Amino acid sequence: MRDFLPVTRADCEKRGWKQPDFVYVIGDAYVDHPSFGPAIISRLLESHGFSVGIIPQPDWRDEKSIQVFGEPRLGFLVSSGNMDSMVNHYSVSKKRRETDLYSPGGEMGRRPDYAVVVYGNLIRRTYKHTPMIIGGIEASLRRLSHYDYWSNKVRRSILLDSGADLISYGMGERSIVAIAQALESGLAVEDITFLDGTVYKTRDRELLERNHARALPDFESVRASKQAYAESFYIQYQNTDHFTADTLYETYDKKLFVVQNRPAKPLLQEEMDRVYGLFYMRTYHPMYEAAGGVPAISEVKFSLISNRGCFGGCNFCALTFHQGRTVQTRSHASIVAEARLLTYEPDFKGYIHDVGGPTANFRHPSCEKQLEKGVCTGRQCLFPSPCKNLRADHRDYIALLKKLRELPGVKKVFIRSGIRFDYVLADDDETFLRELCAHHVSGQLKVAPEHISRAVLERLGKPAPEVYKEFVKRYTRMNERLGKEQYLVPYLMSSHPGATLKEAVELAEYLRDIHYTPKQVQDFYPTPSTISTCMYYTGLDPRDMSAVYTAVNPHEKAMQRALMQFNNPKNYDLVYEALTKAGRTDLIGFDKKCLIRPRAGRGKSGGNKGIAFGGNATSGTYLRGSAGQKMQRRETGPKRKKKTIRNIHKKK
């Protein structure tokens, strides 16, 4: 039946089901689109002959809300949805967000905090012995003990707190089908201890010995000692590749073990094609029409997923823990076939919004050996500089983009999911840069240097500042050749571990020199299972156990943010304080290099009058890629003649 999967018992009856094999409880609204993890998992199970009922966003205060289908034949599946529920709910300053793009009408409050734990306990109150498997981003990144930024404490494995039997972690296609088949065969869920890509709990120490499992520091140790936490985290980080990973276990109360089997094997291209070639309705369930639909679909409805996995190795990113470092791709035929489907949509205007993934311009593993031996342990492909074995080649991606541009009904194909500029520079052939600027930039290209300080970039795992500056030159030069006026928009981050006020001032000076003011400033967000979050919590870099300064005081973080928008009058007092504390009062004055003027008077109201900045700045964009590199500048400072009150009110 080509329709949405059942969301009510009546839907099941239409299909002739007495009870579904699985009931899938999710924190998002039900969107049947391959950009949504629950859609992929449910459709994949369906393709293997299993029936799945969906309970989207149940009322966690009412036990009846998860009894819609009764007890499933094989088990419950639980996911928070496409995002960690805490990231979904709170900004980095821990303020409640006003909207939830994954809920009907963008309404906030339709899922609980720590959704997987809450849903799991809700299920367990009614179905005490029914198998329960949790998965998705929230469960995957909390699979072992982890620092939780929102409660500011180390929490246990989510497997224990949720009451679940298994975690299907990472990209769960292989493990969820294997779990379903094991349950179908009659195997008890507590005996499913042998599958890659899963986490289970046991009291059987002999099982650990038979599987040659490697012990992590126990939970009490990592909770009590930040050094033990950093050591444990880095062992986990080094065991995220299917080919090289050990089985790991963590001890709780001396007799209970949470065991992480090695990650699932990356999907082959034909397997990726099958997953994305499954039948999807490609939109939200019609029950949400009255609320105005689900806003998140608008960002992905006319986008194409080309790849998964990333060998970029950014320390603030959890992709290594979730998708792994081995890039997996779909075939051209699969992607072109999906693009043709888009052209038949009634609201398709001819524009494909994105063709990419975690990193758009990664279309193959970084080197040949990864497919047989996995990624290197203890080494990165691009950081601190590209590995000599790196295969920097954009020819496949160029050919794919050309095929998409030539499809009937397609006017333009954009790239929005981000490119690695250091990988572009590593490719000796400039064809991709030319094609990118000529065909695939929608007025501005977003890139992510993140910072300009060498010390901070080292902690970020990002390339040195001169690499980004070289890309700016080449991008500008290419646009000049093409006669294009196109912007570069850099993503920048404040308060990342390693950034003191000194480095924040260095970034402000760079922004002054390139005449750029970010419209929005992103503070570092300590989310579970990243190296940067480990640094934030422990004050240690787990790679070498060196001490790392981290701004945790909200006022200092506010100063670092303000320095990135030093020309905003509202930020004057914070910028003044930051420059004073950093010993950089030389940047307070009337010279063109100064960030602000001296105080015009005492107090906040007088301080705001003193705003000035060197060279003026554009807001939100910089660097037109046209001849002359014309800058849009806002006239400010003493050159501007003040009108008298009489002039302001003068009648024409």
Predicted regions and their residues:
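Glycine-rich beta-alpha loop elements in corrinoid/cobalamin-binding modules
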Residues: 10, 37, 56-253, 260-261
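N-terminal pre-triad scaffold of radical SAM enzymes
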Residues: 25-30, 291-318, 336, 343, ...
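Conserved SAM/AdoMet-binding glycine-rich loop
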Residues: 24-26, 55, 59-60, 341-489, ...
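Conserved, mostly hydrophobic/aromatic
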Residues: 165, 275, 310, 335, ...
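Terminal amphipathic helices with adjacent charged low-complexity linkers/tails
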Residues: 61, 190-241, 255-256, 264-267, ...
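Acidic, low-complexity intrinsically disordered tails
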Residues: 373, 379, 595-652
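Flexible glycine/acidic-rich beta-alpha junction loops that bind and position SAM and/or redox cofactors
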Residues: 84-93, 141-143, 173-178, 202-207, ...
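N-terminal [4Fe-4S]-dependent radical SAM core
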Residues: 1-19, 29, 231-303
